[in-house]
């Protein structure tokens, strides 16, 4: 049975596709500027991409900047993401530092949702998921393929693996090499809609895959990511344009 998740009155996995805006900044001044630019945009969730910070190697500084995001947008669900270089992020770091940072964010209870990379060691991942949920934070397990689109059955298998690890939300992003690859991702999303009980997020990246960011309500992807001031992944559509497109496609979905 498919279940939804409610975070700060935002229902994920039911009704209309929710829009998350990635927040990308280098330092405190940059962060303040970006926050002022995005605060009136039509989004549902803010994703703080802390791996873009120049101070990403300091847990204390990451916490301080996360607090600033929380203070600026107190009513928006906050997704904390620290994407490592091996999964397409900006900051290369060890497993030890990665999980130490996640633990600190979880213990701070600043985020509402925390991003955890699936292929970071099953024992450590399961422990982080349990710790997040113990502290009232939803665990989003994710995986990114920046060079290919796996077969449909492999995509579904990874989403199921995330659910089996205890995820509250399961996310995968893949890179298409052809239009057929986009269809593979959409078919996998539709299959996961039937097989995975937790909310699923999928996307086919780049210009070729942009249509997948608009088709969530039809195929079963619960959140789409739209750029505010700067893209955090290939193929992101501006938040305002994304909202307008979804308004046309999903009218009456609620």
From Swiss-Prot:
GO molecular-function terms, A-Z: 3-dehydroquinate dehydratase activity
Gene3D superfamilies in alphabetical order: Aldolase class I
Pathway participation: Metabolic intermediate biosynthesis; chorismate biosynthesis; chorismate from D-erythrose 4-phosphate and phosphoenolpyruvate: step 3/7
Pfam families (UniProt xref): DHquinase_I
Active-site residue numbers: 144 (proton donor/acceptor), 171 (schiff-base intermediate with substrate)
Superkingdom field: Bacteria
Residues reported to bind 3-dehydroquinate: 47-49, 83, 213, 232, 236
E.C. number: 4.2.1.10
Listed GO biological process terms: 3,4-dihydroxybenzoate biosynthetic process; amino acid biosynthetic process; aromatic amino acid family biosynthetic process; chorismate biosynthetic process
Catalytic activities: 3-dehydroquinate = 3-dehydroshikimate + H2O
Keywords carried by this UniProt record: Amino-acid biosynthesis, Aromatic amino acid biosynthesis, Lyase, Schiff base
Protein family (similarity comment): Belongs to the type-I 3-dehydroquinase family.
SUBUNIT field: Homodimer.
HAMAP family to which the protein is assigned, alphabetical: AroD
Function: Involved in the third step of the chorismate pathway, which leads to the biosynthesis of aromatic amino acids. Catalyzes the cis-dehydration of 3-dehydroquinate (DHQ) and introduces the first double bond of the aromatic ring to yield 3-dehydroshikimate.
Protein name as catalogued: 3-dehydroquinate dehydratase
């Amino acid at each position: 049975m498919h279940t939804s998740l409610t975070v700060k009155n935002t229902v994920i996995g039911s009704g209309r596709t929710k829009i998350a805006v990635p927040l990308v900044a280098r330092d405190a001044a940059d962060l303040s500027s970006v926050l002022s630019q995005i605060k009136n945009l039509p989004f549902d969730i803010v994703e703080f991409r802390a791996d873009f910070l120049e101070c990403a190697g300091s847990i204390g500084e990451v916490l301080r900047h996360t607090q600033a995001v929380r203070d600026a947008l107190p009513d928006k669900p906050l997704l904390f993401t620290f994407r490592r270089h091996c999964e397409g992020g900006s900051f290369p770091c060890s497993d030890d530092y990665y999980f130490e940072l996640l633990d600190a964010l979880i213990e701070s209870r600043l985020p509402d949702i925390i991003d955890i990379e699936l292929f970071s060691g099953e024992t450590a991942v399961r422990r982080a998921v349990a710790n997040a949920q113990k502290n009232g934070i939803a665990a989003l397990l994710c995986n990114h393929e920046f060079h290919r689109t796996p077969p449909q059955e492999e995509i579904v298998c990874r989403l199921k693996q995330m659910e089996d690890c205890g995820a509250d939300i399961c996310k995968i992003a893949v890179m298409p090499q052809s239009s057929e690859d986009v269809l593979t991702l959409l078919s996998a999303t539709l299959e996961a809609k039937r097989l995975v009980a937790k909310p699923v997020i999928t996307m086919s990246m780049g210009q070729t895959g942009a249509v997948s960011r608009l088709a969530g309500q039809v195929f079963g992807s619960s959140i789409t990511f739209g750029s505010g001031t700067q893209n955090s992944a290939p193929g992101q559509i501006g938040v305002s344009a994304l909202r307008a497109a979804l308004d046309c496609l999903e009218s009456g979905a609620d």
